[in-house]
C-alpha cells in the first residue's frame, strides 16, 4: 500500500508566508502597554507623573508660585522629554485626558507639553519638599481628590503631574524625572498597587 503524498502548491505556500509576515507586522505595531488605556478608563486607576528634567534641587530662596522666573524650571532636555512622554502616551491609545498639575511651573509646563488636553492646577499635588511635616495631610488631600475625580470622570484617563515626594508618599515608590506610576486605588482614593513606566528620554 502506497502512502499518498500531498504537495502544497507554491502559490499557497507564498500566501501563507505573506499572512505570517503581516501578522508579525501587526503585532509589532501594538502599543508597548496594551492595557494602559483600559486601566485608565476603568474608574480605578490614575497616572501619577513626576515632572520632567529640571536642573538643580529644590527652589531658590524666596521663590513665588505665581512667578516662574523665581523657581527651578524645566531645561531644554526637560521640555523635549515632556513632548516625548506625550507622544508615548498617544502611542498607548490616549488621545486626550483630564490633566491636573501642581502649581509649580516645572509641573505645569510638563503637563502642557504632553499635548493631551487643558491643564488644571490642583493644590493637593503641590510639593511639600520645603516642609516634610505636611506629608500626611497633603497625601490625605490627594487621596480625597483622586476619589472625587474618579467618581466625576470614571471613563476618562486621569493624569496627575506632581513631585517625587508626593509620589513616594502616595505609592511608596521613588521615581526619576518624567517617570509615570499607574496607581490602582480604593474607592476612597487610597493606594492599592502600582506599576512604573519609565520616561522616554531625549
Segments from the language model and where they lie:
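A short, acidic, amphipathic alpha-helical segment used as a generic capping/interface helix at domain edges
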Residues: 141-151
Amino acid at each position: 500500500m502506497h502512502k499518498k503524498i500531498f504537495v502544497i502548491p507554491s502559490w499557497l505556500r507564498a500566501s501563507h508566508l505573506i499572512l505570517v509576515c503581516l501578522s508579525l507586522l501587526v503585532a509589532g505595531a501594538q502599543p508597548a502597554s496594551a492595557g494602559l488605556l483600559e486601566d485608565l478608563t476603568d474608574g480605578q486607576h490614575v497616572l501619577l507623573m513626576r515632572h520632567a528634567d529640571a536642573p538643580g534641587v529644590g527652589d531658590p530662596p524666596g521663590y513665588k508660585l505665581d512667578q516662574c522666573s523665581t523657581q527651578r524650571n524645566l531645561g531644554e532636555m526637560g521640555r523635549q522629554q515632556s513632548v516625548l512622554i506625550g507622544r508615548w502616551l498617544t502611542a498607548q491609545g490616549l488621545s486626550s485626558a483630564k490633566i491636573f498639575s501642581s502649581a509649580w511651573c516645572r509641573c505645569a509646563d510638563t503637563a502642557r507639553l504632553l499635548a493631551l488636553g487643558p491643564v488644571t492646577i490642583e493644590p493637593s499635588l503641590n510639593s511639600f519638599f520645603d516642609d516634610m511635616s505636611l506629608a500626611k495631610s497633603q497625601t490625605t488631600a490627594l487621596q480625597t481628590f483622586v476619589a472625587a475625580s474618579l467618581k466625576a470622570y470614571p471613563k476618562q484617563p486621569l493624569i496627575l503631574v506632581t513631585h517625587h515626594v508626593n509620589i513616594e508618599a502616595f505609592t511608596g515608590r521613588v521615581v526619576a524625572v518624567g517617570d509615570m506610576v499607574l496607581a490602582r486605588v480604593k474607592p476612597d482614593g487610597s493606594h492599592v498597587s502600582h506599576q512604573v513606566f519609565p520616561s522616554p528620554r531625549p
